[in-house]
Amino acid sequence: MPVAAYIEERVKIPENVQVEINNNEVVVKSGGKELRRRFEHPKIVIKKEGDEIVIFCEYPRRKDKAMVGTIRAHINNMIKGVTEGFTYKLKIRYAHFPMKVSVKGNEVIIENFLGEKHPRRARIMEGVTVKISGEDVIVTGIDKEKVGQTAANIEQATRIKGRDPRVFQDGIYIVEKAGKAI
């Protein structure tokens, strides 16, 4: 079976974005926003050539090829994050007990969920903002992973254990992920 001697992926850098690469740490800046991430892999090299980021690996194995594509996707998400940002939308649903959802500090507090006396709490990751308007919860930020984790924390805080989710549909559910409707 022939073996590829070289695999390379290129990421185009937009005009209004600055990228710095030091020892496989990629720093992406634009308009006062900055994302920093370190990619540790022994065979993969990341460098900047003109207005492109080049990710390459010599004599790659299957996992090395996959990792090159993964790093490319992470860098694309970093560039999209500092230029556009990411937004997740969640909906508050209840049948009988009206929930009261509020933001205090770095937590989302869910009161009166299924008539419970003690509030449920969901952690907000650093660098993420949560806004509540009516039955909509909007989670925004520049780091896709932190925005997604915050939305998942909110959704998991209202999970009902031991009951059929087809019948008991109360909770807060993700309805749109980074521009894609679910």
Curated annotation (Swiss-Prot):
It comes from the Archaea. InterPro entries: Ribosomal_uL6-like, Ribosomal_uL6-like_a/b-dom_sf, Ribosomal_uL6_a/b-dom, Ribosomal_uL6_arc, Ribosomal_uL6_CS2. One of its GO terms (cellular component) is cytosolic large ribosomal subunit. Keywords: Ribonucleoprotein, Ribosomal protein, RNA-binding, rRNA-binding. One of its GO terms (biological process) is cytoplasmic translation. Coiled coil: none annotated. The keyword rRNA-binding applies. Pfam families: Ribosomal_L6 (PF00347). One of its GO terms (molecular function) is structural constituent of ribosome. NCBIfam families: PRK05518.1, uL6_arch. This protein binds to the 23S rRNA, and is important in its secondary structure. It is located near the subunit interface in the base of the L7/L12 stalk, and near the tRNA binding site of the peptidyltransferase center. Part of the 50S ribosomal subunit. PANTHER family: 60S RIBOSOMAL PROTEIN L9, 60S/50S RIBOSOMAL PROTEIN L6/L9. Belongs to the universal ribosomal protein uL6 family. This is Large ribosomal subunit protein uL6. It comes from Methanocaldococcus jannaschii (strain ATCC 43067 / DSM 2661 / JAL-1 / JCM 10045 / NBRC 100440).
